[in-house]
C-alpha cells in the first residue's frame, strides 16, 4: 500500500437544499423537504389534526340523484 491520497470523485447532491417549510433551515436529504425528523413529524401532525385543508367548492347537486324520479 502506498501513502498516496486516494482520488475520489466529488459527488454532487441530487437537488440543492431548500429551506425547511417548518423552520427555514436548509433541508437534508434524509428528511426532504424538511431539515429534521422533528419538522417532518410536526408537519404530519398538523395534517392529521386537520390544521391543513384542501379547499373544496360546494356543489348543491346530489351526486346520487340521477334525475329519474
Swiss-Prot record:
Residues 1-15 have a biased composition (Basic and acidic residues). Its cofactor is Zn(2+). Zn(2+) binds at residues 20, 23, 35, 39. GO terms for molecular function: DNA topoisomerase type II (double strand cut, ATP-hydrolyzing) inhibitor activity; zinc ion binding. GO terms for biological process: regulation of DNA-templated transcription. The keyword Zinc-finger does not apply. SUPFAM superfamilies: Glucocorticoid receptor-like (DNA-binding domain). PANTHER family: DNA GYRASE INHIBITOR YACG. Belongs to the DNA gyrase inhibitor YacG family. This is DNA gyrase inhibitor YacG. It comes from Allorhizobium ampelinum (strain ATCC BAA-846 / DSM 112012 / S4) (Agrobacterium vitis (strain S4)). The lineage of its organism: Bacteria, Pseudomonadati, Pseudomonadota, Alphaproteobacteria, Hyphomicrobiales.
Amino acid at each position: 500500500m502506498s501513502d498516496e491520497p486516494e482520488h475520489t470523485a466529488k459527488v454532487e447532491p441530487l437537488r440543492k437544499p431548500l429551506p425547511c417549510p417548518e423552520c427555514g433551515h436548509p433541508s437534508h436529504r434524509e428528511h426532504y423537504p424538511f431539515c429534521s425528523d422533528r419538522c417532518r413529524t410536526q408537519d404530519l401532525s398538523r395534517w392529521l389534526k386537520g390544521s391543513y385543508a384542501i379547499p373544496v367548492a360546494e356543489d348543491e347537486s346530489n351526486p346520487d340523484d340521477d334525475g329519474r324520479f
